[in-house]
Amino acid sequence: NDTNQDITAVSLRLNAGTVMADSVNQLETTVGSLTASSAGSVYLLEADDLTVGSVAVSVNRVGSAAGVSTVSDAAQADVRTSANGSIVLRSTAGSLTLTDGNTDGVVLSANGSGNVLVQAQGTGSDLTVNASVQSGTGHVTLKAADAVNLSANVTTSSTGTLSVTAGGALTQLG
């Protein structure tokens, strides 16, 4: 954990074959929208407002004959882990908005015993959950310095617990 941002971008699409940072040194970002897929855990610390949803990528590729072609990749959606990976998504001074990036209704999915922590820190920072947040059997914690607005399911099963903490209003719609 340092004072420098690791990634600054309008939109960020992450895909890792193992873990994405760790609990001691999170991946520090300043981005507007985000999607992540990891075979292990995901640890992200956002500097300001962030929307989780869908990100598509188009790049210019230079071929062996120095020609340039545009390559587009299908959109990646949401934040998902496998192999019992946890999801830790926090902002230091901004609101977090969780939206479904595809049509499955789920925005955050921690596999197996993976835990979920989503925390909007800083004065006036809200957490808005517009799509389902889930863990197989892990714990799910949602926190905001100001309001927490829930308009979707938050689920776990078996030994997992759910915790929602709002410094301001707690609203459940639907």
Regions found by a protein language model. Give the residues of each.
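Extracellular lectin-like interaction modules
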Residues: N1-G174
